[in-house]
Amino acid sequence: MNDMGSSEVNDENKEKEARYSVMTKSELEALAVSAIREHRRLLWADQAVYEEWLRASDDPSISGPVLQTLQDEYVARQKRSEAQQEELSDILDALGFVPDVPFDDDN
C-alpha cells in the first residue's frame, strides 16, 4: 500500500507527465515497447520463482527457512513487478495507445 499523501501523489504525477511530455511519439513508442518486453520478462521470471516455491512447499524435505526465502523472493518480485507495471501504464497513457509487440521466441 502506498503511504504518500494526495499532494505528494499529485506532485509525482505532474513530474511523470512532464518527463513524458518532452518526448516524441516515436521515443515514447520505443520506450513503451521496451517496457512491455521488460514486463513480460518479469512475469515469466516471477512465474518460475512461484512454481519453484510451490514445488518446494510440497516437498517435506525442504526446510522452513528455505521455503521462507522462496516466499520472500516471490513477494519482492511481485513488488518490483507492480512498480514496473505502474511505470508501463504511465508510458502507455502518455503514448495514447498500446503498441503491437510480438512475443519473443525464447519465452
Curated annotation (Swiss-Prot):
Disulfide bonds, paired cysteine numbers: none
Domain of life: Bacteria
Entry keyword Ion transport: no
Keyword Nucleus assigned: no
Residue numbers spanned by region Disordered: 1-20
Any one Pfam family match given in the protein's UniProt record, by short name: Prok-TraM
BP term (GO), one: negative regulation of DNA-templated transcription
Keywords: Plasmid, Repressor, Transcription, Transcription regulation
Gene3D superfamilies, sorted: HR1 repeat
SUPFAM superfamilies in alphabetical order: Transcriptional repressor TraM
Biological role: Acts to antagonize TraR-dependent activation.
UniProt family annotation: To A.tumefaciens Ti plasmid TraM.
Protein name, entry field: Probable transcriptional repressor TraM
Organism per entry: Sinorhizobium fredii (strain NBRC 101917 / NGR234)
